[in-house]
Amino acid sequence: MEGHVKRPMNAFMVWSRGERHKLAQQNPSMQNTEISKQLGCRWKSLTEAEKRPFFQEAQRLKTLHREKYPNYKYQPHRRAKVSQRSGILQPRVASTKLYNLLQWDRNPHAITYRQDWSRAAHLYSKNQQSFYLQPVDIPTGHPQQQQQQFHNHHQQKQQFHDHHQQKQQFHDHHQQQQQFHDHQQQQQQFHDHQQQKQQFHDHQQQQQQFHDHHHQQQQQQFHDHHHHQQQQQQFHDHHQQKQQFHDHHQQQQQQQFHDHPQQQQQFHDHPQQKQQFHDHHHHQQQKQQFHDHHQQKQQFHDHHQQQQQFHDHQQQQQQQQFHDQQLTYLLTADITGEHTPYQEHLSKALWLAVS
């Protein structure tokens, strides 16, 4: 039809466009009805991940169609007007073909192409224009001829009634297919909306992750910079301390040199003073070693005392446990009334230990 703008294909049409051709090549004798049924079942068995590329392609085609036809509005094909002349009659062959077209799968998950419906409508219109009923004359002549004419007229009326019913079924089925197609488009729009929401949510998460990562990097850089500044400050302070110590040492040396020139002269003139200084230093080292040795001995003595105390404490605990066990044994014997010489001896020993 010239000037008619086709609706954009949905996801199922995009997928079945190639699958229908493959299935028809693999099974040349398969009817279009059976092909449509199998395509519908296969599409229903696909997962969301497998359907996603076809939904995306359908969305792309829909966007291109909207850009190409911005003022497009869906207008279903108008049903061809049926002539009210009593002479129109569809032949049995055409009626059978149209009936086969009308018996397409009514499963809501199976979709047939609008081209098939266009062919059916064209066939129906062509048959209407090609066949006519003969006008019925008033019965005259022989009674058998009148009865035959009446019978033919009754058959023509029955055929016209059947044709009208087929027409109504075709119209109802076309409306059902259109409603299902609209439902598919609504599902497609809902799926696209869900995808857009998911993409927006993912974009928000990516922005949040980028913001968190950037914030962490800034914090790490600030921490590193602060640590570097602290190290520089410590190095500077240490350098200042070294410089102060060096200056103080030089001042002390200069002061000592200035205050005791005679001592320096005597130290230089008398090597014995050097020997005395060396002996004094050696004596100080020996004293320090003796002090350290004494501390080690004291620590060893303290450790020995601690071990002795621990050993005495363990012995006391063992004796106390043994005493408690013997006392329990005696109490049990008193309760049960059993007495042995060993129990009497043990009782006397415990009495002496307690007293």
Swiss-Prot record:
It is found in: Nucleus speckle; Cytoplasm; Nucleus. Acetylation of Lys-81 contributes to its nuclear localization and enhances its interaction with KPNB1. Deacetylated by HDAC3. Residues 135-322 are annotated as: Disordered. InterPro entries: HMG_box_dom (IPR009071), HMG_box_dom_sf (IPR036910), SRY-related_HMG-box_TF-like (IPR050140). One of its GO terms (biological process) is positive regulation of gene expression. Keywords: Acetylation, Activator, Calmodulin-binding, Cytoplasm, Differentiation, DNA-binding, Nucleus, Repeat, Sexual differentiation, Transcription, Transcription regulation. Residues 5-73 bind DNA. SMART domains: HMG. Coiled coil: none annotated. One of its GO terms (molecular function) is RNA polymerase II cis-regulatory region sequence-specific DNA binding. PANTHER family: SEX-DETERMINING REGION Y PROTEIN, SOX TRANSCRIPTION FACTOR. Interacts with CALM, EP300, HDAC3, KPNB1, ZNF208 isoform KRAB-O, PARP1, SLC9A3R2 and WT1. The interaction with EP300 modulates its DNA-binding activity. The interaction with KPNB1 is sensitive to dissociation by Ran in the GTP-bound form. Interaction with PARP1 impaired its DNA-binding activity. This is Sex-determining region Y protein. It comes from Mus spretus.
